[in-house]
């Protein structure tokens, strides 16, 4: 019973609590709604006030901007009006200037018309005077023809002939003086260039040798070199083409031969055999082959070093090797490689003085005797062989012509070719460059004079400049100018056929005619 009552009481209390809570929440919600409405009204009022303020501010800014634009427009209109006024003033000034120029031109036109009228009048006067002068000249010519018994054409021919004779003589004198002066200046310049080139080029004195000497540790080695029944020495001589001279010279073997490359190969091979101690035909053959390879490599190195020293680049490798062979070639005792380098230096120096291509000149000078490296192996002169080599390896046409013309076989086609020939003569002619015994030298001078004096009409001959020139004095009443040229050619041919000489020999025939008169 009591529990049921408590349950009912609890339910009743819960119901009352729920009703009370409902009304409380409702009153709270209504209060919040009223607060929110009031807040919204307040915000709306503030927004209206701010909008009104912004509207007034925008109106004020718009008024200021309108005022500013109006002011700028007024200033721009004022500036344009001022500029238009200035342009109008300038146009008015130009118009005034044109009016003044127009007046000036009118005045000048009037003056020119007056001058033209004056010139027409003067021209008429001149024509009248010319007519009168022509009549007077005609009368004078007629009178002169009557007095001199010569027509006008005859008199003109006489005067022109006399003038032509006088002018021709004066021109001939002037031409001769110019030629003499030009020759003197050219000779002077050539001497300066040659002296400068020779001063700046230093070269060695060389001498020819046809033997080499190999030193031995003792004389017992000579027997080992000879071998049993001479088989070792025969093998070495057969393989190298060099004669071995074993005599009483202590501790030395002499190698004799005219081919320097073979002689050098034999020397190196024999030196290696002596150092090795094993000397028999098989070992000799091995050492000779090894020495040939060493000599070939040395020749190539010499060629490369030569081109580097002279400053010539771009040569074909085969041509460099052929150039190195010149180290073992001599001409009248002068080493051909040293001679070629000397010619290259001299040609380059002279070309530089004349404003020519110095590098091309050195190249031509270095290769001018390239044919001498193999002229003993190939048919033909060293000039022909050199031209073939240069053409084969596509050298410059100037280089080819320099090789072909440096001994006068063909005409030089460039200044460099002439310089190469001059440098070749300088290198060969300098003291000590080429060896020649005193006996041969004197015999050659005597033979030169003997050949020259063997011709009819020759009065006297002189061999000068160490036998490099022969001067022949002829009788002018027996030998005329044309005969003098023929005589020089004949003597030159006989010298070439009958004499052996280094370099060139210049043949000069001198015919002197003297006319003497005595004024009393």
Curated annotation (Swiss-Prot):
**Where does the record place it?**
Cell membrane
- What PROSITE patterns would the database entry show? HD, KH_TYPE_1
Question: Where is it mainly found?
Answer: membrane
Q: Which major enzyme category is it? A: hydrolase
Query: Coiled-coil intervals in this record?
Result: none
**Where's the KH domain?**
210-273
Q: What is its EC number?
A: 3.1.-.-
Cite the entry's keywords alphabetically.
Cell membrane, Endonuclease, Hydrolase, Membrane, Nuclease, RNA-binding, Transmembrane, Transmembrane helix
| Molecular function as annotated in GO | RNA binding; RNA endonuclease activity
Q: How does it sit in the membrane?
A: Single-pass membrane protein
Question: GO CC terms for this protein?
Answer: plasma membrane
Chain spans, region Disordered: 86-116
Q: Record's PANTHER family? A: RIBONUCLEASE Y
What does the UniProt function comment say about this protein?
Endoribonuclease that initiates mRNA decay.
Family membership: Belongs to the RNase Y family.
Q: What protein does this entry describe?
A: Ribonuclease Y
Q: Which organism is it from?
A: Bacillus cereus (strain ATCC 10987 / NRS 248)
The protein's gene is named rny
